[in-house]
């Protein structure tokens, strides 16, 4: 009886922490220390961030919850606790050998812990520089990707994961220190992640990464406040034709009136730090960079940097 009570108390404490997954990581009043040109060196930036994440403990072990513990809970025990937005912890430092084919990663869960946006700032000398600034998360408990699956193969002597299915996108909004909000579609659609080194073994320290597709935040049927859309709605707002006189201002109005379904790209890097051979589980940290919402072509996308944890399970195909 005492053991059951202890487990229940641990789960309740986990639920309390789950409601504040990014609070201690995204203080809006201070700028991040990471300053880089992410377009020129995404892999170098991701490697540095991965090293920092690996050094620090992203989740306190006392509040971590395993997949087995999650499975033991029913719907009412999970409802309203935030646990559904959490990735499980993996216990163990084993290693798993990947077959050449016939295997897949299932139940892949990707949970961001920090959200930063690339911003142009001016220092005391008046010099302009770009650096990632911390933001405040405005989205509640619906920003974690879960249930993702895909093929796991060995291609050209390196392990490769190809994403195929699952809840692989989540509409998310963050707020900059000045109050400006940045919506973006957190995703790993069509991800092809390759190992950084050769071999067929996944063990602590294993790294892989690759590019993915970032669809438009809005679909073609979306209408803006003036009733304009990509596939339906008005062609332009009332009284705007008179402003479009063939001189300055036409380009801005054209982008506002002509909605497009922008498809961008992103880059993600994973590093494994826990492996459970018996359950086939792997866990670790990730760093991802991608573009933000373009308001269907009327705005330039901002660069968003996300860092957090992931969980996955290696299984044979049925």
Swiss-Prot record:
Tree of life domain: Eukaryota
Membrane topology, as annotated: Single-pass membrane protein
Annotated keywords: Chloroplast, Membrane, Photosynthesis, Photosystem II, Plastid, Signal, Thylakoid, Transmembrane, Transmembrane helix
Keyword set includes Chloroplast: yes
Transmembrane segment boundaries: 45-65
Gene3D superfamilies: photosynthetic oxygen evolving center domain, Photosystem II, cytochrome c-550 precursor
Any one cellular-component term (Gene Ontology): chloroplast thylakoid membrane
Pfam families: MSP (PF01716)
Signal peptide: 1-18
Compartment(s) where it occurs, according to its Swiss-Prot or TrEMBL record: Plastid, Chloroplast thylakoid membrane
GO BP: any one term: photosystem II stabilization
SUPFAM superfamilies found in the cross-reference section: OMPA-like
Induction context: Expression shows a diurnal pattern of oscillation across the 24-hour light-dark, with increased levels during the light period (at protein level). Down-regulated in the late stationary growth phase as compared to the early stationary and exponential growth phases.
Family: Belongs to the PsbO family.
Functional description taken from the UniProt entry: Stabilizes the manganese cluster which is the primary site of water splitting.
Stated name of the protein: Oxygen-evolving enhancer protein 1, chloroplastic
Source organism (scientific name): Chattonella marina var. antiqua
Lineage: Eukaryota, Sar, Stramenopiles, Ochrophyta, Raphidophyceae
């Amino acid at each position: 009886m005492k053991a059951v009570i202890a487990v229940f108390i641990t789960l309740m404490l986990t639920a309390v922490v789950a409601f504040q997954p990014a609070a201690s990581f995204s203080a809006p009043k201070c700028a991040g220390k990471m300053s880089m040109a992410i377009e020129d060196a995404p892999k170098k930036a991701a490697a540095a961030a991965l090293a920092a994440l690996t050094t620090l403990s992203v989740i306190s072990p006392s509040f971590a919850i395993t997949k087995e513990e999650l499975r033991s809970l029913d719907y009412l025990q999970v409802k309203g606790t935030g646990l559904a937005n959490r990735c499980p912890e993996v216990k163990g430092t084993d290693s798993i050998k990947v077959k050449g084919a016939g295997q897949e990663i299932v139940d892949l869960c990707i949970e961001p812990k920090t959200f930063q946006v690339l911003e142009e700032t001016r220092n005391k000398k008046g010099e302009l520089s770009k650096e990632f600034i911390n933001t405040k998360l405005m989205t509640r408990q619906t920003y974690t990707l879960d249930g993702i699956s895909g093929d796991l193969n060995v291609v050209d002597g390196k392990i490769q994961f190809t994403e195929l299915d699952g809840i692989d996108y989540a509409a998310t909004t963050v707020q900059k220190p000045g109050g400006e909000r940045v919506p973006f579609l957190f995703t790993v659609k069509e991800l092809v992640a390759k190992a950084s080194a050769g071999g067929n073994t996944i063990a602590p320290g294993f790294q892989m990464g690759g590019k993915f597709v970032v669809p438009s935040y809005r679909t073609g049927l979306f209408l803006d406040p003036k009733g304009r859309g990509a596939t339906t709605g008005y062609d332009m707002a009332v009284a705007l034709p008179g402003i479009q006189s063939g001189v300055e201002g036409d380009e801005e109005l054209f982008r506002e009136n002509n909605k497009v379904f922008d498809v961008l790209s992103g880059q993600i890097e994973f590093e494994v730090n826990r492996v459970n051979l018996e359950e086939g589980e792997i866990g670790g940290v990730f760093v991802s960079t991608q573009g933000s919402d373009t308001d269907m072509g009327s705005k330039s996308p901002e660069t968003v940097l996300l860092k957090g944890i992931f969980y996955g399970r290696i299984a044979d195909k049925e």
